[in-house]
């Protein structure tokens, strides 16, 4: 799986993008066309796998765009659409799942406890 992160800027009506830690660059007149070009460039290495992307505006003239090649389909992977934090490209150890807190079951109150019944 490959993760490509791009910093996008709008200068004088033209959108440009540079890969955060790499050599891929692209430019286009609209953010949509820029995204299409970046997805094509990132998936050129291996187009057999699925591609997932996320475009987040930071300011009216800048954005962050992330392309994940080889993403698992069917909603098994989630990509943040507007928050911070990037995905790690290395296969590090998975974080431990938080321990579930024990919840005490609340007893349902019956009609008898209130002194009346539905059928009285």
Curated annotation (Swiss-Prot):
A single GO BP term for this record reads: translational elongation
Kindly provide the PTM information from the record.
Answer: Phosphorylated.
Chain positions covered by the region annotation Disordered = 83-120
Keyword Ribosomal protein listed: yes
Tell me which InterPro entries the record gives.
Ribosomal_P1/P2, RPP3
Residue spans crossing the bilayer: none
Q: Which UniProt keywords apply?
A: Phosphoprotein, Ribonucleoprotein, Ribosomal protein
* Superkingdom of origin organism: Eukaryota
Question: Does the record's keyword annotation contain Ribosomal protein?
Answer: yes
The family note in this entry says:
Belongs to the eukaryotic ribosomal protein P1/P2 family.
Task of the protein: Plays an important role in the elongation step of protein synthesis.
User: What name does the UniProt record give this protein?
Assistant: Large ribosomal subunit protein P3
Q: Which gene encodes it?
A: RPP3A
């Amino acid at each position: 799986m490959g993760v490509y992160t791009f910093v996008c800027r709008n200068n004088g009506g033209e959108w440009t993008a540079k890969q955060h830690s790499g050599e891929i660059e692209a430019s286009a007149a609209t953010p949509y066309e820029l995204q299409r070009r970046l997805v094509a460039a990132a998936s050129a290495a291996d187009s057999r796998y699925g591609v997932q992307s996320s475009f987040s505006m930071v300011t009216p003239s800048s954005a962050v765009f992330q392309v994940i090649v080889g993403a698992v389909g069917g909603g098994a992977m989630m990509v943040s659409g507007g928050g911070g934090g990037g995905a790690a490209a290395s296969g590090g150890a998975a974080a431990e799942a938080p321990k579930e807190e024990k919840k005490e079951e609340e007893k349902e109150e019956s009609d008898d406890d209130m002194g009346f019944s539905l059928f009285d």
